[in-house]
Amino acid sequence: MLLQIQDGTLSIGAQTVLAHFDFEIRGNEKIAIVGRNGCGKTTLLRLLAGELSLDRDDHSKAQGILTSRSLTTGLLCQQAFSDTTITVEEELLKSCPCPDKWDRERFTWEQEYDRLFTGFGFSKEEKRKRLSQFSGGEQTKIALIRLLLAHPDILLLDEPTNHLDVETTEWLEEYLRQYAGAVVMVSHDRFFLDRTADTVCEF
């Protein structure tokens, strides 16, 4: 068990969005969250990312979110970049774990960077373009690249195939199937979920 929620309830203001629910991630599961619109799927992702908290109930036996160890999570955000005047390379280098460009770890990171960048349909020359020169859909792709480069223990994806063409979607499917960590995803693309998820959780 990597993460577990037992009898959790989450409210936003006076509205209860998720009531008395259970949720669990085992190992490197690839989990599809499905359900009607407005049932709280995106809210669950925000909870797992630490942006929201479960309601406190002193009478409940539930202990909130239990984890087997300290975990890192990564959520694909809609408003991805605070400064769009810098280049793609400048933005992505912020998350590079090794500032020394001659370090072996830096070399490995840059190889992964190149693989992801071209995998999402960009040319290497576009790394030098400013973020403001890319469309909203392209910026979403770049935000996803930044997230994947961080290799979080739990990857949280909300409609990751939006703005992706068929070829790029298929590339992402293969990447996620081989991803070493857990993935929790929300998508209206059932074909994408069928090809990437090994567990379905209905809300």
Q: Where are each of the predicted segments found?
A:
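ABC ATP-binding cassette signature C-motif
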Residues: M1-F203
